[in-house]
Amino acid sequence: RRQRQMCIRDSPSFKAIIYYRIAHKLYEGKHYFWARWVSQKGARKTGIEIHPGARIGKGLFIDHGNGVIIGETAIVGDNVTLYQGVTLGGTGKEHGKRHPTLCNNVMVSAGAKVLGSFTIGENSKIGAGSVVLEEVPPNSTVVGVPGRVVKRNNQSVPREDMNQIDLPNPVLEDIQRLQHLSLIHISEPTRHAQI
């Protein structure tokens, strides 16, 4: 009993989820002003901003939640874990569903940004500081900017699939092609003069 009281009194994450649940009920009842009022009060007190229109399942755990943002059309499944500084945001380009869907048992590490209307498959992990802009298959691990799948079903993805060092450089390729053409052009008159 004492631990529960300490949890309620001391945990900003727990308080943020309580504020969200109240605001979401108001939002579903079309009491938008009061829903936003409760939501903003919760954000000011906890540092965690959860839009009352977001749909969140059971067992959400926000660890060290300062700076967590969950957008209006985000859908969060059951038993999801979010760490500090996570954003489930939109790109601002879509109408309607603009935010991501996180399936059950997803973990999003500190500072990761998941931006856009797509799905993160169940049991997936998003690495710290990653920026995810596209669909993630179930049972995957994603890291980097932009986010790339480095593990699927607990098996590493082949290195050539995630090579970020030897990326094509179209500008350099064009310069090399032009240099080659200029060398051919320079050598042609000499060849004609010898004939």
Question: What are these model-derived regions, one by one?
Answer:
Residues 2-45:
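A transmembrane-helix-recognition feature enriched in membrane-embedded lipid enzymes
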Residues 3-7, 188-190, 195:
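Short, small-residue-biased leader/transition segments that mark boundaries at the very start
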Residues 12, 135-137, 190:
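Short, proline-centered helix/strand-breaking motifs
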Residues 17, 33, 75, 170-173:
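Charged, alpha-helix-enriched surfaces in structured cytosolic catalytic cores
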Residues 43-150:
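Structural signal for interior beta-strand "rungs" in well-ordered beta-sheet cores
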Residues 97-109, 113-114, 145-183, 187, ...:
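C-terminal segments of enzyme domains that contribute to small-molecule binding surfaces
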